């Protein structure tokens, strides 16, 4: 049947196969031929009927089966080779046979007689591709080994953290021991505090004492100079005015050897250091090195000599030179003296500045001891002088004499200051000693009065 079909086939004697889904081509010159759709072919198509038609259908079915196998192999080959997958057609060669083409242009298959396909030969490369993929997997396994090494390193780091934790655990008991020691020290301090309480005794003594100015309130302050207790600022100011106290500690005050402590030694050392520093500062000061107004000082001496007063001036740096405020008034042609008043019975001392020389001594003493015109605070301080019935006596020490020979001039309270200072030696400014006349029981004052009276008698 196959030989008959081949004979009744195409004029070339070759068999014609159509791919699956492809339509057969019409034979050249055939009148009665038809295509797969049933259209009549050109030529004598009416003669081809019967057995030849059945054989062609069987051959077509075999061709379809072969094409199905080829199609499967083409699909597998397209997955491996990307270049062939992009193409939408396949050629299959057949020895000594014509090419079968699809009219729609879907696929062109070429098949050889021995049914050896080119596609099968190209599929041999597929295992090589798989082996390459296996190699890639082996490389990945190498990376996994590296990750495992990193994990071991992290474990070593964790071991170092454990060491730190052990150090922290070791340091914790040390801190606890330190806290116990600090608590023990605090307990010791608490126990020692009752022993330090005797220092508070001086504060308690100060609190129990009364104010020496008002006498009603408890004392809160103590003057570092006169050591008097005070309770408030008004009392402090009042005691300074009554006692003429500066409130500054006397650094040169006498301290007995029994009462001499390390604080006194430190005070003396600091005092000497201050003196040395002041002297060095003065020696470096260019302003102080300039010549003083010596002409004015000579003028003061000459004017005092014309009035019969022997004025002596001390060098710069002495306290009396700094305190002296005596000036000469050119308009009134008179001296304005710096006068110091001392009241031994009340242990008081006052200073009068710019006192005109034509003013009497009674006028100078009136603001101090006058019962009516004196200041109430000063009158209270000088109560012994204000209430005295015998009056007062004004004395002035004789200058330019030996220290063991104390002499005093007795001044007339009804004369002016210039008349009382006439024919006398004055060092910087006059100092008047106001004493009570009825205090003859005091030997020191008695000696002073006797010497002053003798001096006054010899002068007459």
Swiss-Prot record:
GO terms for cellular component: pre-snoRNP complex. Residues 1-61 are annotated as: Disordered. InterPro entries: BCD1, Znf_HIT. Zn(2+) 2 binds at residues 223, 226, 239, 245. One of its GO terms (molecular function) is ATPase binding. There is a cross-link at residues 71, 101, 110, 130, 137, 147, 154, 164, 191, 449 (Glycyl lysine isopeptide (Lys-Gly) (interchain with G-Cter in SUMO2)). Zn(2+) 1 binds at residues 211, 214, 231, 235. Transmembrane segments: none annotated. Keywords: Isopeptide bond, Metal-binding, Phosphoprotein, Ribosome biogenesis, Ubl conjugation, Zinc, Zinc-finger. A zinc finger (HIT-type) spans 211-245. Residues 19-28 have a biased composition (Low complexity). The keyword Zinc applies. The modification Phosphoserine is found at residue 39. GO terms for biological process: box C/D snoRNP assembly; protein complex oligomerization; ribosome biogenesis; snoRNA localization. CDD domains: zf-HIT_BCD1. Disulfide bonds: none annotated. Pfam families: zf-HIT. PANTHER family: BOX C_D SNORNA PROTEIN 1, BOX C_D SNORNA PROTEIN 1-RELATED. Required for box C/D snoRNAs accumulation involved in snoRNA processing, snoRNA transport to the nucleolus and ribosome biogenesis. Belongs to the BCD1 family. Interacts with FBL, SNU13, NOP58, NUFIP1, RUVBL1, RUVBL2 and TAF9. Interacts (via HIT-type zinc finger) with the RUVBL1/RUVBL2 complex in the presence of ADP. This is Box C/D snoRNA protein 1. It comes from Mus musculus. The lineage of its organism: Eukaryota, Metazoa, Chordata, Craniata, Vertebrata. The gene is Znhit6.
